[in-house]
């Protein structure tokens, strides 16, 4: 390797984020030896150790921490360069098919699609909502071009590009907020919970948050719509745990108190595509907007 491999740099950042080679390999759809080889080659190129094992997994060395900081800036420069070059092209057109969850569709994707329509009026984006498993299957079968889904994902020959961490927050009606002194699993499990329906990735994540502290959930309601959940909470029928993006805007959080949980609960969203998918100008434009929504 005669130049710094940006792909290996991205793998290194993911290894540190996930805390192990195996976890990074699962996200990337690679074998653990393949991930380890990329890190070794990166270390050989830089002639220094970048990672070390601890009792809690993999962590960056001092040199690795420095590389992480530079890596974020390198990625930003690369993204800026791509955006600048593409500014000379005015023929972004065609149709993209995208799958995502209902919450991300409404609260994250909608403003991005509006911006995409302004910037590239000849580009059409068709959106399908569903759960992560169904979206990944559709991508593998080439029925969708790409997905914006929750990690982890498992699939054959997929490119996985983490784009953002999404926090989950506690919500209750403003009239009832004084009844909730602590927002821990132990304190909340006895309170009436209005939950997402069983079988969704969101429900599994919340179940896991309680289970990690030895607490079993006993929801008083299980609903499939986040808007229905918020209506029930506003009516004072219980509390819920929802993605922060669903209550980010003033109109979305009207009548609700919104607070972070202890410990914090979050998940990671990623853009997923087939590795053999041709990266059209339209797909590239949409990926850039998802990665940097404020800079589009």
Outline where the language-model segments fall.
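Short helix-boundary/capping micro-motifs
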Residues: 13-31
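A short LG(V/I)-centered, amphipathic sequence patch enriched
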Residues: 43-65
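Central regulatory/effector-binding core of bacterial HTH transcription factors
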Residues: 93-156
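A late-sequence structural motif
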Residues: 108, 257-296
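Hydrophobic hinge/microswitch elements
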Residues: 131-136, 140-144, 149-150, 201-257
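Flexible hinge/capping segments at coil-to-helix
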Residues: 155-193
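Beta-alpha-beta core module
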Residues: 155-162, 166, 180, 227-275
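Secondary-structure junction motif
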Residues: 178, 192-213, 279-287
